Amino acid sequence: MSASSSSALPPLVPALYRWKSTGSSGRQVQRRCVGAEAIVGLEEKNRRALYDLYIATSLRNIAPASTLLTLQNLKEMFELALLDARFEHPECACTVSWDDEVPAIITYESPESNESARDWARGCIHVQPTAKSALDLWSEMEEGRAAANDNTPSKSIELFLLSDVSTDSTPIPQDATVEILFHSNHLFWDGIGCRKFVGDLFRLVGSYIGRSDSREMKKIQWGQEIKNLSPPVVDSLKLDINTLGSEFDDKCTEYTSALVANYKSRGMKFQPGLALPRCVIHKLSADESIAIVKAVKTRLGPGFTISHLTQAAIVLALLDHLKPNDLSDDEVFISPTSVDGRRWLREDIASNFYAMCQTAAVVRIENLKSIAVSHKDEKELQVRALESACRNIKKSYRQWLENPFLQALGLRVHNFEASYLHAKPIPFEGEANPLFISDGINERFIPHEIKQTATGENVLSVESIDFVVNQSLPYLAIRLDSWRDASTLNIIYNDANYTEAEVQKYLQSIVEFMLAFRL
């Protein structure tokens, strides 16, 4: 499969991706996946959870002494909050199926009664009295799935509540930790939608804290929530895709050509195979993060961000790792990347759009030979190389993000990519470029505290947030986000392809280049 012309890219036909009522009850709707959904919904991979999302949160009990928290009553409170959230965002209860087409089918079925809805919520929330962390549980779950050869698609959302107590009815001491692992099937959400939903749950659960009737659920008019499903993204764009012409076709071809070229480009050498998803994490302190941001603004200007610097550091660390002696004067780094597509949706839809909404851009850094530096070089030489790379990166994003049709482009090229990966599940040949995604500031979606709604008192403090995605393709996926002014870098990888020591060393190199940029 090639991307030599726009003829390789079938046109977008909105009617193919709209919700349709199925069955005679009027309680079930379905639609076909489109765009990035089609990639993460590929049957072989989705059945094995190979793109699943996890958000690991660590909370501290800061409730007043009069508020008793146990794993069991937290479970009951989160069940009720989940029911409220389901009414507003039914994506959390969607399911997946497949037929003879590449894109999967998403189905939503409204519960028949409040009792069946409560049974669904009970099955989504689990508790464990344990000293394990949420990330420990992630590893354990993936190891168990692999050992059992489980091919059951993951639910749209599940919660696992953990605390180091004797039983699920043991009071959780003040200042003790409650870890919550949110597990999502990526088909139904992107990272932003998932974070928004977690934030909603943290706000909604406050309504049930301290209530004597917290086990009682309110009556919900099930069936009415179907109208709250995120509308088809193809019908939510600011523009009419039927008006798109040759400029759109040319840009689609430019992206798919870059995508295919990326599969064959210079990158990290990997061992073939598929084993378990793993993650290494580096948390910069708030002081380090603030100093880096200040340096970026001072050296480069107010339009630059820590994300530009991180992408630059990733490329410098790659060159330092490879130490190529055959770089030509005109060799470039090209990497497709993922971008939040909500800015291209209509304003009345964008802020409340929880389903997958990712589009595509291409980062291009010119003249790699001029930025091939090492940590042993003078700081000023490293800084100049980082500045040069940052300017190339910002220019790349500007050239792509200024296109009014970029979300439509993402839908079309990701449809192509899904078919490409369906035909060739491992498109890389011995080497793979790292992929960078900036997730931004978590406070945009998730509150610092869970409050008791009736009193306004803080009950649980959200101390940390870690976001991981199961990795199956043999590249290193590097993510950046922040919480309470402190930035976190993590690398997600598959341990068939790389050793933990290799990945740790590469992550440390990225961090060192970023820290070298400080004033």
From Swiss-Prot:
Biological pathway: Sesquiterpene biosynthesis; trichothecene biosynthesis
GO biological process: mycotoxin biosynthetic process
InterPro entries: CAT-like_dom_sf (IPR023213), Tri3/Sat12/Sat16/Mac1 (IPR009992)
Knockout consequences: Leads to the accumulation of deacetylated calonectrins.
Induction: Expression is positively regulated by the trichothecene cluster-specific transcription activator TRI10.
Binding, 15-deacetylcalonectrin: 414
One MF annotation (Gene Ontology) recorded for this entry: acetyltransferase activity
Keyword field: Transferase
Its EC number(s): 2.3.2.-
EC primary class: transferase
Coiled-coil annotated spans: none
Other known facts: Trichothecenes are sesquiterpenoid toxins that act by inhibiting protein biosynthesis.
Function: 15-O-acetyltransferase; part of the core gene cluster that mediates the biosynthesis of trichothecenes, a very large family of chemically related bicyclic sesquiterpene compounds acting as mycotoxins, including T2-toxin. The biosynthesis of trichothecenes begins with the cyclization of farnesyl diphosphate to trichodiene and is catalyzed by the trichodiene synthase TRI5. Trichodiene undergoes a series of oxygenations catalyzed by the cytochrome P450 monooxygenase TRI4.
PANTHER family hit by this protein: CHROMOSOME 7, WHOLE GENOME SHOTGUN SEQUENCE-RELATED, CONDENSATION DOMAIN-CONTAINING PROTEIN
Homology family: Belongs to the trichothecene O-acetyltransferase family.
The name this protein goes by in its record: Trichothecene 15-O-acetyltransferase TRI3
Gene: TRI3
